[in-house]
Amino acid sequence: MEMLKKAILKALEDKYNAQISEADATLKIYLEQSVGIGEHPQHIDEVDKLIEKIATAEEKLEVLKGYDD
């Protein structure tokens, strides 16, 4: 049972870290290479959504730590 718990927690940790990496990479494109995304009038809204994704995933990682014995 302990191995299953660890496997689930590790899978969730990997998932949240991947979400952070994906949002961070996209955010860097918006902030550093905006020519790469073409005409897009809602840059601020999109950047805000990406920051929200990062914050949510980071918060989930913190909660996850409480279940790692």
Regions inferred by a protein language model and the residue ranges of each:
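Extended, charge-rich alpha-helical interface modules
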Residues: 2-69
